[in-house]
């Protein structure tokens, strides 16, 4: 366990394993992406860190944290987010990197990739890249409104940055910027993601992740992405089956020269 200090003194937890070209994963939990990261660390330097927006939300933090109140923001603090990402990379001894993630953290990785001058590639799974942000904006705004109406304003704050992120993302067209990334570009997903038999169907079935990615495979290909479909896996399985997923991701990264 290691701690990086942001420019304003905020403490950020991170873990770095392996040597080689770097992959940086934002994570919601200290355990998130640990198994995948360990599998990838045979060839890469894998850095996982918790962005300040998730600190203390899903698990308690003793070492990380600091003064931070997202409730007062009326626009997404993109400069702070990128500076934090770079502070972690510096602490981990990383220069340029491929930014990576799965599901919600894939969204954050994809949002940051075009604006970080050190992110040269993107490796994301379980998220419909280039499919627009309307569904996810509605998800965040609906969750926030429900909590406010239930008298849980303190919990509603947890969705404040999410709604600001998707509002800003909806005003951007990142297609050209993503195509211009010089490093690896990979999207992977389970063939059953958000289908009726998916274990996440009752929560985000409307996202139709597998169908959305398939329908944009040609567009992703034109932007330089390799699209990997993990046969028979749902949203959970396309991350949890490390022995199936990791070799395919390594092959795609190596094919792209990483």
Where in this protein do the model-derived segments appear?
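Short beta-strand element of the alpha/beta-hydrolase
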Residues: 20-28
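Conserved alpha/beta-hydrolase
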Residues: 38-66
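Conserved acidic catalytic loop of the alpha/beta-hydrolase fold
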Residues: 79-97
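Conserved hydrolase catalytic core segment
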Residues: 95-130
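Active-site nucleophile elbow and catalytic-triad environment of alpha/beta-hydrolase enzymes
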Residues: 161-177, 210-215
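Short beta-strand/loop motif that positions the catalytic acidic residue
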Residues: 181, 187-189
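Conserved loop-alpha-helix segment in the C-terminal half of the alpha/beta-hydrolase fold
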Residues: 195-232
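Catalytic active-site module of serine/aspartate enzymes centered on a nucleophile-bearing elbow/loop
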Residues: 221-258
């Amino acid at each position: 366990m290691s701690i990086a200090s942001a420019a304003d003194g905020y403490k950020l937890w991170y873990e770095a394993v392996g040597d080689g070209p770097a992959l940086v994963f934002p994570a919601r939990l200290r355990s998130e992406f640990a198994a995948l990261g360990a599998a990838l660390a045979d060839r890469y330097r894998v850095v996982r860190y918790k962005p300040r927006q998730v600190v203390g939300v899903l698990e308690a933090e003793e070492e990380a944290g600091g003064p931070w109140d997202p409730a007062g923001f009326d626009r997404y603090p993109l400069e702070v987010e990128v500076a934090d990402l770079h502070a972690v990379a510096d602490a981990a001894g990383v220069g340029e990197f491929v930014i990576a993630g799965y599901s919600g953290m894939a969204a954050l990785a994809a949002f940051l990739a075009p604006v970080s001058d050190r992110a040269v590639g993107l490796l994301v799974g379980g998220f419909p890249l280039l499919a627009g942000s309307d569904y996810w904006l509605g998800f965040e705004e609906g969750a926030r409104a429900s909590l406010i109406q239930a008298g849980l304003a303190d919990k509603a704050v947890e969705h404040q940055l999410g709604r600001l992120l998707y509002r800003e993302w909806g005003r951007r067209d990142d297609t050209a910027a993503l195509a211009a990334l010089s490093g690896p570009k990979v999207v992977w997903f389970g063939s059953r993601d958000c289908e009726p038999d998916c274990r996440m169907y009752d929560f985000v079935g409307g996202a139709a992740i597998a169908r959305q990615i398939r329908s944009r495979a040609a567009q992703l290909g034109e932007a330089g992405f390799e699209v990997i479909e993990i046969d028979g896996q749902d949203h959970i399985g396309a991350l949890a089956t490390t022995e199936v997923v990791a070799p395919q991701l390594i092959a795609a990264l190596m094919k792209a020269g990483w």
